[in-house]
Amino acid sequence: MAEVERKEEQAKIESGSNEQKERGLDGVNKGDAVGDGKEGGEAKKVQQSPFLTNAVPRKDEGKGGEERDNIDAAEVVEKQRKHLEENQSDEILFKARCKLYYFSEETKALEERAEGTMIIEMHSKSNLAKITMFRDQIGRLGCNHFINPRFKAQPHGKVSNGWMWMSTEDTVETDALRKKIQLFVVKFYSEEDFKRFGEEYDLGRAHNEKALKTKTNKK
């Protein structure tokens, strides 16, 4: 019975999120995303994004122009462990229990990633607001990225106490490295946590937009 309820809940999430992902991808394809773009059929060089969350390589170029995944699972786990140690001084703006979903490029559907604790924090080194989700028990991250000013968080119409948003630089899972843009859905267990997340996300988004403009003007 629990399995049936889980599948029904996931089906609701998928039906309400595909349209949002398509709109976001359309925006990226028009060239307004943070990251790589193309012009005249040739790739153009861009500066490294300020939203990179770790040093895990995205892909290696193989012979004949083919790309191969260059991902070491043990390295990913070690980098996430170091993240927990190195960011203990960050200011916690929001913290609550949740269930996190992500859009899988393999199944073309939303998949449950984990239950755990969602945190919005002010990163002390960059002075940028970021989102981090810690999974229960296994001590790994469910997501880890700075809030991109381009992407608003929107209530998920078919999931109670649910928000959805996108990121261009989350790389905590190997699946995330296969696609530039990531769609996340989070479900909170209380209306209060749902409201507070939306408020803190908006504040963090506005803060990051201002901070990034200031950094750009100083160059």
Curated annotation (Swiss-Prot):
Residues 1-12, 33-45, 57-72 have a biased composition (Basic and acidic residues). Residues 1-72 are annotated as: Disordered. SMART domains: RanBD. Transmembrane segments: none annotated. Residues 70-210 form the RanBD1 domain. It comes from the Eukaryota. Belongs to the RANBP1 family. This is Ran-specific GTPase-activating protein 1. The lineage of its organism: Eukaryota, Fungi, Fungi incertae sedis, Microsporidia, Unikaryonidae.
